[in-house]
Amino acid sequence: MEENNELINNPAVEYTDDNIRHLSDMEHVRTRPGMYIGKLGDGSHAEDGIYVLLKEIIDNSIDEFKMQAGKKIEIIIEENLRVSVRDYGRGIPQGKLIEAVSVLNTGGKYDSKAFKKSVGLNGVGVKAVNALSSRFEVRSYRDGKVRIATFAKGDLLTDTTQNTTEENGTYIFFEPDNLLFENYSFRPEFVETMLRNYTYLNTGLAIIYNGQRILSRNGLVDLLNDNMTAVGLYPIIHLKGEDIEIAFTHTGQYGEEYYSFVNGQHTTQGGTHQSAFKEHIARTIKEYFNKNMDYADIRNGLVAAIAVNVEEPLFESQTKIKLGSTNMAPGGPTVNKFVGDFVKTEVDNYLHKHTDVADVMLQKIQESEKERKAIAGVTKLARERAKKANLHNRKLRDCRFHLNDAKGDKKEESCIFITEGDSASGSITKSRDVNTQAVFSLRGKPLNSYGLTKKIVYENEEFNLLQAALNIEDGMEGLRYNKVIVATDADVDGMHIRLLLITFFLQFFPDLIKKGHVYILQTPLFRVRNRKKGVYETVYCYSEEERIAAIERLSPNPEITRFKGLGEISPDEFKHFIGKDMRLEQVSLRKTDLVKELLEFYMGKNTMERQ
């Protein structure tokens, strides 16, 4: 039930029985979608709501596979808009089919005997998909009968039962409601990443996505091999136990990288299982070598994956991206103890049996320690300098809300524009949203950091101040902005500055790019306008093709302006380019890219090959 907001805003309004509203389950989901799927979005980001809808449907099919009912899931996404999912499990019990997809808190997964370690939250998930779809259809195939029900925005339209020769299982079709997910589109790369993660966690499961077969034979080893952007220093260590699987290696890159899962769910923000692994992997390695090692040196360059199965898992949000459970099961061991005991026993045994791997690991840790100590003096001075500069730093014009705030609904909107020079930063500063948009101004071209050690991050004032502004010296957990946006001119010099900044991030903070935080701001190349009936009609063009189309539309004799740099765009105009319709291009790495080779080719010495 809800109280009318008018009562709160205007106490003089009479408060009667008529002010009390009861919402049906489907109405409640549509009225408060964020409670069920997080943010809505349009599909341009991997966390957007349409991917949560897809995941909720697939989760139920995955649970069938886990119950050894069906080894194949077929998924078709038509025109990146309409989704159908067919599994070959047992099929939803037909007598309760309507309730199972339309009545909240109805489902078989409350019976832990049937689904002891379930990923699909049957009480809510599929119902939310139904409510938030303009069209929804479910078919349950069981023992020669198929029951078919169709819905629109959660309302039942048709319900029929007929004979069938098809195999048992469930078919679901849905089309997200464009009124809620405005101009949405499923991005194949986000969908494929999601589906591959399902196969890594469920070896032997075949997912057929738009005709493409996705399969994993080696679980988390395949995950690391497919996602690592640097060569492992030793073969991936892969260890499995009851309800736990881990895989890890070290690379020559800076930082740490983790992939964590609970009951097949990718916990992108980690949680108690990932924290336990980080703590105990470092402690176990330190105890094995029996040396006075710093945990940061042990974990530097570590790339790891951990998957656990938890009974009745508790997540910190409905989207299930961070595990909050303290216990593996009601009355069972804590997550920390369970993970710690496994890591301590299995990793220690492995290192004793594979001393050649242990030798490589020790060498890597000692190299990290040597570099850390070499820059210790510099980092202390740099931190003091950055602290003083941050108090009156003209380079950083900060915003009010940040990604690492404890609370707040604007955290995800926080961003920082990295610009070149005062003219460009001045225009952005005057037109920005001070609540969520910060500006960092570079002084000319930054240093080419390729091949340099992390010492340069502290010795170079601009790099040190940028690192301090982002708050990433000690890892991504403290990152202050969800989007780090490079805003440079669209000329050769601007492109060079982009490359230099991306090199800096890839060299020292690769997770910033791997986790999808870095973007390029697309600004218009042309302004085409024409005065009609005393009013200017203006079109901003981002390409030559758009310019030609605008000239045709605004003919005859339109006025054409070419923007040579960001500084030429007035603050009044700039606000159009950094508002809700801001065009951003995400900086991403292909799975086949190796960072070292990539940087060597583009930013290394001018060899014959590069020429």
Model-found features: residue ranges?
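GHKL-family ATPase ATP-binding module
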Residues: 1-19, 50-55, 63-66, 70-88, ...
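Alpha-helix capping/hinge segments and adjacent helical runs
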Residues: 25-26
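Conserved helix-loop functional segments at active or binding sites
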Residues: 31, 35-38, 59, 63, ...
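Conserved short strand/loop->alpha-helix "switch" segment adjacent to the catalytic nucleotide/phosphoryl-transfer site
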Residues: 32-54
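Flexible beta-alpha connector loops of hexameric P-loop NTPases
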Residues: 40-48, 268-269, 330, 448-459
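A short glycine-centered beta->alpha linker in the GHKL/HATPase_c
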Residues: 91-94
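Interdomain boundary/hinge elements
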Residues: 113-114, 146-151, 206-210, 510-529
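C-terminal interaction appendages of subunits in large macromolecular complexes
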Residues: 370-391, 406-410, 414-415, 426, ...
